[in-house]
């Protein structure tokens, strides 16, 4: 029981520990559980090629293939937001290429709508749009559909 509690404490303290490192780029990714190790290795390589020394903190629901693939700046660098779009795009494409998703447990919402249009099959987008409309057309994210007509939130307003 003590070991279980200690492991949970480590998991629960991850976000706070990372906040102490400064700015963060957060990614909510899912891939089939059997591909998680491959995803993490490839994603680390992508991130290190784009920003040598970046501090990578993958954690989360690893048993079901969901991972918070969060990044903190290299030591001595305060802001690295200029690479946010490039890193996000590359990680999203990697996850999709592995039959995964760039929008795991936190969903698509307004922040990821453009990526959904870019990476999701048109038939899938159509089904998702019809399903959303039939379930909550007037409740949540009114007007948000998979058609690029809704402007994504600026990065500063996400998360």
Predicted regions and their residues:
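C-terminal substrate-recognition/cap domain of FAD-linked oxidoreductases
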Residues: 1-90, 94, 98
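Short proline/glycine- and acidic-rich turn/helix-capping motifs at secondary-structure junctions
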Residues: 1-9, 103-118, 147-154
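Alpha-helix capping/hinge segments and adjacent helical runs
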Residues: 96-108, 133-141
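Short amphipathic alpha-helical interaction segments
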Residues: 79, 83, 87, 108, ...
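Activity-critical C-terminal alpha-helical subdomain
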Residues: 113-159
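Gly/Ser/Thr-rich helix-start
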Residues: 61-66, 101, 108-110, 144
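Residues in flexible loops and secondary-structure boundaries
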Residues: 15, 37-39, 64-66, 70, ...
């Amino acid at each position: 029981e003590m070991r279980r509690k200690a492991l949970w404490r480590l998991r629960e303290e991850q976000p706070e520990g990372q906040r102490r490192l400064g700015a963060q780029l957060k990614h909510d990714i899912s891939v089939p559980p059997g591909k998680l190790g491959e995803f993490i290795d490839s994603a680390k390589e992508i991130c290190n090629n784009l920003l040598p020394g970046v501090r990578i903190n993958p954690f989360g629901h690893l048993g079901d293939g969901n991972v918070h693939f969060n990044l903190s700046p290299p030591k001595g660098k305060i802001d690295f937001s200029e690479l946010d779009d490039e890193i996000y795009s590359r990680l999203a494409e990697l996850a999709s290429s592995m039959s995964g998703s760039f929008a795991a447990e936190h969903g698509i919402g307004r922040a990821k709508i453009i990526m959904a249009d870019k990476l999701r099959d048109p038939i899938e987008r159509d089904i998702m749009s019809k399903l959303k409309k039939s379930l909550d057309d007037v409740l949540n994210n009114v007007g948000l559909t998979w058609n690029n007509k809704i402007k994504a939130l600026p990065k500063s307003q996400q998360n």
